[in-house]
Amino acid sequence: MEAQSRSTTASEKKKVENSIVKGHSRTEVSEKAVASSTTSNEDESPGQTYHRERRNAIAMQPQGGQGLGKISEEPSTSSEERASLIKKELHGSITHLPEPSVPYRGTVFAMDPRNGYIDPHYRSDLDLFPAFHPPVPIDARHHEGRYHYEPTPIPPLHVPTALASSPTYPDLPFFRISPHRNPASASDSPFSPPHPYISPYMDYIRSLHSSPSLSMISAARGLSPTDVPHAGISPAEYYHQMALLAGQRSPYADIFPSPATAGAGANALHMEYLHAMESSRFSSPRLSARPSRKRTLSISPLSDHSFDLQTMIRNSPNSLVTILNNSRSSSSASGSYGHLAASAISPALNFAYQPTPVSLQQMHQQIMSRQHSIGSAFGHSPPLLHPAPTFPSQRTIPGIPSVLNPVQVSIGPSEAAQQNKPTSESAVSSTGDLLHNKRSKVKPEEDHPSPGAVCIQDQPDGMTLVKEEGVKDESKQEAEVVYETNCHWEGCSREFDTQEQLVHHINNDHIHGEKKEFVCRWLDCSREQKPFKAQYMLVVHMRRHTGEKPHKCTFEGCSKAYSRLENLKTHLRSHTGEKPYVCEHEGCNKAFSNASDRAKHQNRTHSNEKPYVCKIPGCTKRYTDPSSLRKHVKTVHGPEAHVTKKQRGDIHPRPPPPREPGSHSQSRSPGQQTQGIHGEHKDLSNTTSKHEECLQVRSVKTEKPMSSQPSPGGKSSCSRQQSPISNYTNSGIELNLNSGGSIGDFSALDETPIMDSTISTATTGLGLHGRRVMTGTKWMEQIKVEKMKQVNGMLPRLNPVPPHRAPTLPPITGNGVQLNSNISLGGLAPVLPNRNDLSSMDITVLNMLNRRDSNTSTISSAYMSSRRSSGISPCFSSRRSSEASQFEGRVQNLSVAGSYDPISTDASRRSSETSQCDGLPTLLSLTPAQQYRLKAKYAAATGGPPPTPLPNMERMSLKTRMALLGDSRDCRLSPLPSVNVPRRCSDGGVGSYGRRHLLPNELQVNGMRRASDPVKMVSDNVSNTRVVRFNSLNNVIPPDVPPPMERRNLSLQNYTRNVYSPCPPSISENVALEAMIMEAEGNFDDEDLLPDDMVQYLNSRNQRLYETIETDALQNNAGERNGNNFEQSHVTSNVINEQFHSSEQTDLIENKNDLPIQWNEVSSGSAEYSPSRLKYGQRFPTQQNQPFGLYNNMMVQQQNVPKSGLSQQRGYQHHTQNNPQAPQQNLDLYNNSNVWSGQLGRGNQYIDDIERSSLGHSATGSLCNSAARGQKLTTNGLPMNTGQQNFGPSTHYSVQSANRAEVVQNENIINQEFMQQMTAEHLIYGMHLLGVTRSNQTTSGQNGNTTDGTRSFLSTTQNGGEQQPTLAKNFQSFVNSSGNSRQNLHRNNLPYLQEQIYDTNQHIFKVNSIKMEMQSHPQQHCANAQNFSGQLYDQTATYPQQIMKSGSEPGMEANCLLQESNNTNSSKLLSPGANHVTSTVDNIDNSLAGVQIAFAAIIDDGDHASLISGVLSPSIIQNLSRNSSRLTTPRASLTFPAIPVSTSNMAIGDMSSLLTSLAEESKFLAIMQ
């Protein structure tokens, strides 16, 4: 051949050249000719048409005159055909190689056959590829799709005759680009068959490229497979030449001619050529310049035979490069078309310009051992190819059995390890094997063993043993790492001709033969004969040894096959475009086809976490995703480095076991790919692998599922299904759970998840700290720290002192969730160094104030807080915590993380009770005003919007506003007042109480319940007089209220609660009350705040109440006195501020209670009445109206001399009459009860009103109201048999202490008793008093005192006469709360009630403080009973909780229900406080029929219409009050005096409508006129 080429003369060459140039007609060239042509793509061989058999086609003497007629577009034959034809190819002889007259553009040098070098002045006869431009430069033009190709005439092809006969050089291009251009080495012509490397390479090349791609592309590039490795060219020279070519026209212009310039024949040829190169038909090694990270498009341009390059370019500007580079469109060049890439299209296209010089030996190794199929040798992508002998395995032609997969060449594991040692490429993350992965995310793409490839693991040099070409090939299956045909099963050495036969043999003879033992006995299997759990697992495992890949891609043009079905499924997503794995980071919509990619994305993009740690001893590498880790393990540590199953369970997560041979990591090093044989890529079966693949990492649920979180299946981001990007099946890479390592101990996280609502747990004391320091989560903490820094910029002092670990609370087990909080709660070490600084509690409180605010917390880390958790507070994040229970020794969840909202890892946003520390100020203990201040401070600190102004704020005096906005009163450590009493007093024991009883929710009977769940109201008889939900004033030491406050009626409409209301006022009420109290110093009267009409109305109403109450009290003092055996101690303990209960205050409070509540500042959850609330949600007006309605738990012991001595005297006298002992007590009571008498500020007048009301004015509110308002006095008069209820911590009153003589002696006790009992007392007074009195008689009957008072009382009660104690009256009126004459039910219920009371009385002193069954107790006692039970229920163990539990309770309860039904008369139901608000003064008396509305519920439920939304139908209000699902805890419904429906009402609305409501409020006031 070489001689012949030399023999041609220059003149001949010129002649031939001319003829070629002039020849315009094109001979018809079949696809086969094109495929086999070694010349330009547009081989214009003037000779005969070429046939598929290259030898013949190329051997045919080209005839210059003939033009290429038509090119058949039939796709190239299958790999099988190609394989069979490879050796049949003959090159037509090239007779003349005309000497180039002029160098082609840029300098296209024709190869001088004499020396194999390009001589610019030597023009081949063929002018071989004048039409080919220099290789396509990979530059911006390509990426932008702006590279245009200019087709040029194709000269006739002249092939030297010698070449034609040489089977050795079928595909060799005829010119070689060499910077040398040195003809001196003419003797070295590579075309010389004797060339030492030609034969091996040619055979190999032919076997690899039976299609024209090799010859055409190689020639097109001016690069001959033989020439490249030629010893005459140095890497530097070759690279230099490549560089020269890079600037010239691309030889592909002819292959991909522009439509305009390319003739139809040319286009056909090009298309044909492309189809021939199509991966499905002509799989070729794929050398991806840079594997793309992008998912593939669902459509594949090559799937259609009519592939249109222009269309592809138009569709994806970067697609051209993708095609050329076989890349899935790298990140730089997006627009990839799925698995299609240049390499997929043609091996020729795979020949990227190798930036790195490739030495002959390197080339040899690459080709032979790596099977990069020439593509690697002539690597397309310079950046990826490296001179290192180990080139990333490129795709071998799947159909060519002779072609060994890069992996097939199983260089011994050691070799593999060496070669695999991170050739930069293999080390390059996700630049996986150039041939195998085009960075395609489908790991399996590389895995297909070429069917014909023999397992070359034995070849020491990486020389692949090519078995007879193509006999064994699985036509479309890509080259596998292993193509085993010999059985290496223990004791079996059978050899088979095909892999299929081997597989069949193994399955039938070995696997099924050992039916009960699923053990791989393959020699050298890394599983070490560990049995599989199931047969299918073993079957799948064996594919690793045999290289079988039964799962083939069904998409046209894709020849990928996988050994595992899940890998195929993942791969198919590259075709379908399905991306089921969506980034879990909120706001990020990226989706991925596999979980591994998502994990990688999340960990790289949204965090710096690298949870996947290499477990190989001494290796400290960490990765963001399992695929990268697997790749690292395979690449760096070798195939044998995979972790065995036994390691999986270890604390130390094992490194991911190497992928199955078919699923190699993206950049699998060549040696590693041989793992299929040696290393057990899938040491586990699917199941195992699944387990492994899950990586057992449970990403911490960050606040918004931001950081790497478990994939949809709960698996960690590492998903079993291999992500196309991660080219390896997720073998089980386990997250390093070592606290010292990667992600820290996630088990710890699982136990104590980072609190969602907490602020960065590590940086601020605001969050509960995980039980362990999780080093692995430090990144999370860092994120939170960054987040906090932003906030801290605004909150510089945000809890500057980290929470002390020493005082950490014991695990709260109340909910079964144990959270060790570092937050110092209770009186623990001051967590809040500066009271002016927002503490964690403060922040918590702020968040709790935002009832609906699941996301309000700006502090809560976007990463670490659950979006669902409302608060940043570790403790009170429950956005609707119905009760922040105190920690005063009670077992309650600090942050009921699991209580009710399993979604939130932190505190349940609706936890019915977030516990609060006893003594530490908490939101729950704040008054609305304080809350407002806190919110304002928080807003100022965080730059947030100011809080919604308090109701009536516009009417508040400047002083009051300043007080609201000013710092809280002397709180010990924070702006928040200390918690003296439970928020709802549901805890029973206030911080000051020496002891308290278990709350219903603490008992199993009550259990934890969702705040919104209705609660069977407990009779409050056991509770310490329930205090305001926020304990607003209870926890605050209010300023002294000057005596002048005669009628400090809070003019906030319908504040109808007394200080001692068993159902403490809601926040709304507290707000108003707080404001008033804060102004108390200024002695602002209602007149200061309310319109004259309102004031007048309130005054008139109060007068009536005073009178009624006074009368009742006087009448019943003596009898009631007997029940009083309270010790001043408990009273004192209850006393939060004696001063606070000045007469004015009482009056103020009461009047305040009469006003409608508008303040909706806090979430309903915070205002909820704890489970101890009245069973029916009825709020007994008596209690509500009690002067101490807000201070139910406050046994304020007023030692102040009553301002209204007269009323006291009257009451005293009255008591005296009924109870000889009463005088002293009464005196004390009255003295002490400035609270009621003085506070009422009305003295006699008030009593008179009460008397009038209770005795004669059933219309006034049927004593239910008078009891509500008057029983304060009456109970005063009746210091209460409820004296039994020792409501204080010192509630140690017991049956033994029933001595009434002591009662007489305990003067203050009466007051205290009265004060404490005010709430319960009213109930007792209204319901239980009879029974209690009798109980006093019964239990304390030994005491004549008791007997006297009690008897007199009972007798009067039984008489049913007008002289009946107000109890009977109250009970009747209460029963008839609907406004009906109390005798209606009196006849029926009173005697019955009395009986019941008698029965229950017996239980009075037997009450077990622990027995919180009061909820089930009859609300028989109805509102009063309920109030009573609610108040007593926790207040004293001694007080008979069981009073409410008598066997006859059901009947009483029925009565209550009846009453309730009466009360719920829709015609009378109006918005809370409707009784006061809209009715005119005239209506009030008659309309105050005790309409029962869940006042607190409505008030606290911010979802209702605006605060003053105009007239609402009573039924609506009723529904709101009783049925509001928003209510965290049903409150006792307020029994409001009925008001004609016609009158307009106020409804509690959203805070958002507060402004509007304020405006409407004025309107309402106007209406009042």
UniProtKB/Swiss-Prot annotation:
Record-annotated disulphide pairs: none
Superkingdom to which the source organism belongs: Eukaryota
Keyword Repeat: yes
Keyword Nuclease: no
Record PTM: Phosphorylation is essential for its proteolytic processing. The repressor form (GLI3R), a C-terminally truncated form is generated from the full-length GLI3 protein (GLI3FL) through proteolytic processing.
Compositionally biased intervals (Low complexity): 1335-1350
Record's GO cellular component terms: cytoplasm; nucleus
Gene Ontology MF: a single term: zinc ion binding
Region described as Disordered: spans on this chain: 1-79, 414-461, 625-731, 899-921, 1202-1228, 1335-1364
SUPFAM superfamilies: beta-beta-alpha zinc fingers
Basic and acidic residues bias: start-end ranges: 637-653, 678-704
UniProt keyword annotations, A-Z: Activator, Cytoplasm, DNA-binding, Metal-binding, Nucleus, Phosphoprotein, Repeat, Repressor, Transcription, Transcription regulation, Zinc, Zinc-finger
Main subcellular location: nucleus
Zinc finger (C2H2-type): 485-510, 518-545, 551-575, 581-606, 612-637
GO process terms (BP): positive regulation of DNA-templated transcription; regulation of transcription by RNA polymerase II; smoothened signaling pathway
Compositionally biased intervals (Polar residues): 1-10, 416-432, 663-676, 705-731, 1352-1364
Subcellular location: Nucleus; Cytoplasm
Entry similarity comment: Belongs to the GLI C2H2-type zinc-finger protein family.
Described purpose of this protein according to its UniProt entry: Has a dual function as a transcriptional activator and a repressor of the sonic hedgehog (Shh) pathway, and may play a role in limb development. May bind to the minimal GLI-consensus sequence 5'-GGGTGGTC-3'. Has an essential role in the early embryonic patterning of mesoderm and neuroectoderm.
Family matches, as PANTHER family: TRANSCRIPTIONAL ACTIVATOR CUBITUS INTERRUPTUS, TRANSCRIPTIONAL ACTIVATOR GLI3
Record-given protein name: Zinc finger protein GLI3
Organism: Xenopus laevis
Gene designation per UniProt: gli3
